Amino acid sequence: IIISISLSIAYYLYNSKKEYESYTIKLEEYRKERNNFLNNSSSSPLRNSPYKLSYYDPNVNFKVIASIMQKERIDTITLATSTGNSERFIDFATLNFKLGRSKFTLPVYKYLEGENKGDLFFCFLDKTNNNSTYPGGRYIDIEFENAKRIELDFNKSYNPYCVYNEEFSCPIPSKRNYIDMEIKAGEKLSK
């Protein structure tokens, strides 16, 4: 029995290490693509900017499965932007997830107008803001269509474009989007 348990533990640890290595490789590829776009695209906010992207080390503890609760009643919400204006969204759904031992429920919005009309928008604030990350929060690109669950990977969180270029107007997350912990994952401010 002891040998069987030891073999099971060794197998689990080996597979966990392999999964982590595979995940890290995929995340690094994602970051390289993002860096390539932001450093080379003519539509990039980093064009003519000295800003360099900086990331936290990959951390699989910040990759979670979130349950989706779509709203039965559609409301609109207005978020302030980095340029002092405001932008309207549909208060579309909530994501329920667990990080460590804490449970969180954060809203997902849908763009109501503009070039992103109909796209989902997930933003958050956390305890790293004003320290190692942008004070106005970070974003994660998500998509789902009639799904009940979604992978929410904070390692793919990024700074809004207004961090790199003041000409961009970026929605600022509301207090409903606050995660009461440090999310040391994804993009951070470069030093």
Where are these regions (language model features)?
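Solvent-exposed coil/turn segments that connect beta secondary-structure elements
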Residues: 69, 100, 125-127, 155-157, ...
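Mid-length scaffold segments of soluble, non-membrane domains
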Residues: 74-136
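N-terminal secretory signal peptides
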Residues: 33-87, 91
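Acidic, glycine-rich flexible loop segments
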Residues: 122-158
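Hydrophobic membrane-insertion alpha-helices, especially the h-region
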Residues: 1-12
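Extended, aromatic/histidine-rich regions of cofactor-dependent oxidoreductases associated
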Residues: 21, 159-191
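Ser/Thr/Pro/Gly-rich low-complexity linker/stalk segments immediately outside membranes or between
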Residues: 15-29
